[in-house]
Every structure is written in C-alpha cells, then in structure tokens.
C-alpha cells in the first residue's frame, strides 16, 4: 500500500491511499494537483547517512568509513511534494536522491535482522546540500541543515512494494540527469538502524536515510527536480536560490 497525507480543499489533514496517481479517502477521489501533499510523517528527527555506496566512494575518492557515517537533520529542513526548496543567499546547491526509511514504532538497541519489526515504510528523499565547501561545519548544520533542505514524499510505500535494490531516476526540468540503482551498499538498512539505535531512541515517524548512490548534481534557480524510486513514486519539488 502507498499511504499519503494531504490537506483537502476544506483545510483538513487527511490520511489517504495513493492509487495510480489518484488519492483515495473515504470514498472520494482527488487528483494529486488538486490538494496539498504533506510529508508522509512528522519526524522529530531525521538521521542521514553519508558515503554508503561503493561506486560513489570510488568516484569521489574519499576514505571508506568503518561504520555508518551519520548526521542529523532537524524537522525545519523538511518540505514536501510540489513545494519549493530555498537555498540560502549567495550559495549554490546539489541534489542527492535517497531512500527515506520511516520508523513505525519506538525502538532502541535494534539488532540486525530485527529491522522489519520497526519500519513502517519507505519514501523518496532529496538530501539537498550546499555545493560550496563551508569552513567550521563538521556536523553539516549549514551544509545540509538549512530550512527546506529535505524534500520528502510524496507517499510512504509499504516494505513489500520496494525491491531490495530499487532503480532510481533523477530528472531536472524533465530531462533525465541520473539513472542508477541502490546496489553496492557498504552498510545495509538493518546495520544502519542498529548503529543509530545503539545511541538514540527513534520514535514513530522518525526517518533515516541509506545515503545516495550517485554523484550529487548542481541545481539552478527555478529548476524542477524529480526523483523517481522504483516501488515508491516520484517526488517533485522546485529550487529557489535566495538573493
């Protein structure tokens, strides 16, 4: 099943299902562009993973991590389908298509192999990052923590719908820029969850990512970014470079 949170024309927040591009709720059908699509969950925290794919590590010639390389993204970074991500003034940015893993129930000290008990489903994530090298920013607060830096959505797809290594396609203004899949992980979803929950309690709705398998691509003011992940849907958002 693909669940979707949306705001109807009466201003009410609804939890519907996404069926072939149409939203269903209580016997009514809505076209996607008729309603405001909301983030698929309201996380108290987002934990992102960097440099988790062998091909990307080889391309960028960075040191292979010995354990998942994690960093925080706070709720202010979230925006949703069909919204605008605004990059701080004077800076440029890159897109990074990723799988977002949505937690279904509170968890701590999860063991590898137990992860499916705690995962509600998957969504698309664009972990937008500042392109410039920023000094004195070891936790990526400036680089990846600015408002609207994390478009997510449009749905939460149940685990049975998403292959183990799904295909991903990224389009900019309708043109395919990247086409790849999520094979070649250094650390599996279960290993990442185990590492996070060794230290941190995750709550329902919290999200972690498994990282991007592709080299980030530069975006321009006014661009429309689309991230398709097999089994989920296509996340679409705009880019604004603040003046």
Residue ranges and their predicted role:
Residues 1-68, 159, 171, 175, ...:
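N-terminal non-catalytic cap/leader segment that marks the start of a structured domain
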Residues 7-8, 38-41, 62-64, 70, ...:
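Solvent-exposed alpha-helices and their adjacent loops that cap or buttress functional pockets
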Residues 17-19, 33-40, 56, 86, ...:
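Catalytic-pocket segment enriched in acidic/His residues
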Residues 31-35, 64-65, 78-91, 137:
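Short acidic (Asp/Glu) patches
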Residues 44-47, 68-70, 76-77, 98-100, ...:
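Structural motif
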Residues 52, 76-77, 104-109, 125-131, ...:
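Short acidic/polar capping segments at secondary-structure boundaries
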Residues 63-81, 95, 226-230:
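Structural signature of FAD isoalloxazine-binding scaffolds in flavoprotein oxidoreductases
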Residues 96-125:
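RNA pseudouridine synthases
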């Amino acid at each position: 099943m693909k669940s979707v949170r949306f705001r109807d024309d009466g201003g009410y927040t609804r939890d519907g299902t996404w069926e072939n591009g149409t939203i269903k709720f209580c016997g009514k059908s809505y076209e996607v562009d008729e309603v405001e699509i909301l983030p698929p969950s309201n996380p108290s925290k987002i934990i992102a993973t960097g440099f988790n794919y062998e091909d990307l590590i080889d391309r960028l010639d960075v040191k292979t991590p010995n354990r998942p390389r994690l960093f925080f993204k706070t709720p202010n970074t979230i925006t949703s389908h069909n919204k605008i991500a605004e990059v701080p003034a004077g800076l440029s940015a890159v897109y990074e298509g990723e799988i977002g893993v949505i937690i279904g129930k509170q968890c701590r000290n999860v063991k590898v192999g137990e992860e499916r008990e705690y995962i509600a489903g998957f969504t698309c994530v664009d972990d937008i990052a500042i392109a410039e090298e920023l000094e004195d920013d070891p936790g990526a607060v400036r680089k990846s923590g600015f408002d609207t830096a994390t478009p997510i959505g449009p749905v939460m797809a149940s685990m049975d719908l998403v292959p183990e290594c799904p295909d991903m396609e990224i389009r900019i203004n309708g043109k395919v820029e990247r086409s790849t899949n999520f094979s070649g992980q250094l650390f599996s979803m279960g290993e990442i969850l185990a590492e996070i929950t060794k230290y941190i309690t995750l709550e329902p709705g919290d999200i972690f990512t498994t990282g991007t398998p592709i080299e980030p691509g530069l975006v321009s003011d006014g661009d429309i970014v689309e991230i398709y992940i097999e089994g989920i849907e296509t996340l679409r958002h705009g880019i604004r470079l603040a003046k």
